């Protein structure tokens, strides 16, 4: 079965201050997130900022792996940069 996982990212207050001072800070994290998805051999379908959401970023991938396997991706995303991610939440869409 194919899935689309949307991982919504709320960044920390410290990260938000850095992001507001320099928009490249967020862009750099998104570029690294793209590399994480590529490393896990998943198809990137969405990368950016969700509209009208509490979270600042969203990473969307299309894959046939289970949610447990996708957890390895989110773990790597959490560890891109210390103190960047406050929390992440996943939305699953089955195809």
Regions found by a protein language model. Give the residues of each.
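Short amphipathic alpha-helices in soluble, non-transmembrane regions
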Residues: 69-78
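Acidic-histidine catalytic/liganding microenvironments
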Residues: 39-40, 77-81
